[in-house]
Amino acid sequence: MDISALFLTLFAGSLFLYFLRCLISQRRFGSSKLPLPPGTMGWPYVGETFQLYSQDPNVFFQSKQKRYGSVFKTHVLGCPCVMISSPEAAKFVLVTKSHLFKPTFPASKERMLGKQAIFFHQGDYHAKLRKLVLRAFMPESIRNMVPDIESIAQDSLRSWEGTMINTYQEMKTYTFNVALLSIFGKDEVLYREDLKRCYYILEKGYNSMPVNLPGTLFHKSMKARKELSQILARILSERRQNGSSHNDLLGSFMGDKEELTDEQIADNIIGVIFAARDTTASVMSWILKYLAENPNVLEAVTEEQMAIRKDKEEGESLTWGDTKKMPLTSRVIQETLRVASILSFTFREAVEDVEYEGYLIPKGWKVLPLFRNIHHSADIFSNPGKFDPSRFEVAPKPNTFMPFGNGTHSCPGNELAKLEMSIMIHHLTTKYSWSIVGASDGIQYGPFALPQNGLPIVLARKPEIEV
């Protein structure tokens, strides 16, 4: 059988299974007294995945909400879904009734990250993992990382001087190196390039269809995933042989009295890299764009950072205390997180039939709280399309600003993310200027919304001035 015939057979089989599932679902839901939420399910199997990832997510989500209301159904990444777009609904799913909605991801991403990763669990195992991750990422732990993160930031900036760079790609390298530092300390130096090579192949298949055939993105990614696990096994073996203790994330995992298995450790390390890298790099790209487009804000941030620099001796490093003297910078980060809404939504799965606002959310269906819709609601944030850090001079109302999620599954590494962004902004604004190359108003859509072409910029060193 040639390859085209094989794919045709697989497609026909998938189509048959899709219609069979639809028939079973129709019979099951037909006996329920509650209706499904309004909405459309798109094409067989692929649903509305292409529409979601090929256009402005604001247009996709807001047009659905405008037509169907704050609760509607769709079909993306091979899954029937209910999308919710109000603070009250998000709280219902993520906090109040979180036990009815287990965390989940598309099948391809679950297999690549590993089934033992913290994202996919609830109950005692999740609580145990979260405690271990928080132990490594709490302020008392990451405050000691400031000099090393600063060194990574300075090395990155020096390598960008005088050249045109793709901001997103370079920030991915920066955040990847910070992620490795937080996970392995300085022990990963010998394996850094191999870890990077394997992970870069792995990430390309995160949103692919889970078809494990030679030549597919999924197949290539799973091969890289296997090699990544082998590298992590070598690192674990070396640490056990050395017998020394470490204050990094790997040390936290290995120091657990109940002992995680090597598979559990590997799955969660890969999961942390996934959570720490692309999202933070995306936010940093948007920060540079918004600062370049808002010179008054850039000037004010620069003044704030220069005031910190003036208190330093030549070559003196930043401290944890310095990073807490950046209120405007913090508001810039918050407003970027709101406007860009890197995390447009999160995935949950109903563990039983659930009623919400008179609609049935069937067991097994994915439920997606739409953070982007909430962050761009004019009822919550006035003039929501405008970049205005001053709006965060007053704390937002509960459940209206959720850039790191909400509830027990909120991102445990958010303090580290804000720290590495603050350190990078300090050195960018006090030592460098940058200009955007080409049009700056385009947006590139995919798993994350990015500035067009990753925001090409030219970075130049500022003349040295007396401080």
UniProtKB/Swiss-Prot annotation:
Pfam hit, one: p450
Gene3D superfamilies to which the protein is assigned, alphabetical: Cytochrome P450 (1.10.630.10)
InterPro entries referenced in this protein's UniProt entry, alphabetically: Cyt_P450, Cyt_P450_CS, Cyt_P450_E_grp-I, Cyt_P450_sf
Tissue: Mainly expressed in flowers, siliques, roots and stems. Lower expression in rosette leaves and dry seeds. Expressed in vascular tissues of embryo during the seed development.
A molecular function GO annotation: heme binding
The enzyme's E.C. designation: 1.14.14.137
Reaction equations catalysed: 2-cis-(+)-abscisate + reduced [NADPH--hemoprotein reductase] + O2 = (+)-8'-hydroxyabscisate + oxidized [NADPH--hemoprotein reductase] + H2O + H(+)
Entry function: Involved in the oxidative degradation of abscisic acid. Plays an important role in determining abscisic acid levels in dry seeds and in the control of postgermination growth.
Family, as annotated: Belongs to the cytochrome P450 family.
Name listed for the protein in its UniProt record: Abscisic acid 8'-hydroxylase 1
